[in-house]
Amino acid sequence: MAQVTVGENEGVESALRRFKRAVSKAGIFSDLKRIRHHETPVEKYKRKAQQRRRSRRR
């Protein structure tokens, strides 16, 4: 779950920007897209291969 605490002198726009970045980094939207639609075995293989490549980079 992405969580952002807003500071006293921080604007809403910058907090929203940080929240969007945290959501994209956590991969929440990609999970939602995957759950919403049927995933074929080929798509599942490609997704897992991409996850493996990402984890190797870090």
From Swiss-Prot:
Residues 31-58 are annotated as: Disordered. PROSITE patterns: RIBOSOMAL_S21 (PS01181). GO terms for molecular function: structural constituent of ribosome. Keywords: Ribonucleoprotein, Ribosomal protein. GO terms for cellular component: ribonucleoprotein complex; ribosome. GO terms for biological process: translation. It comes from Prochlorococcus marinus (strain MIT 9313). Belongs to the bacterial ribosomal protein bS21 family. This is Small ribosomal subunit protein bS21. Pfam families: Ribosomal_S21 (PF01165). NCBIfam families: S21p (TIGR00030). Gene3D superfamilies: Ribosomal protein S8.
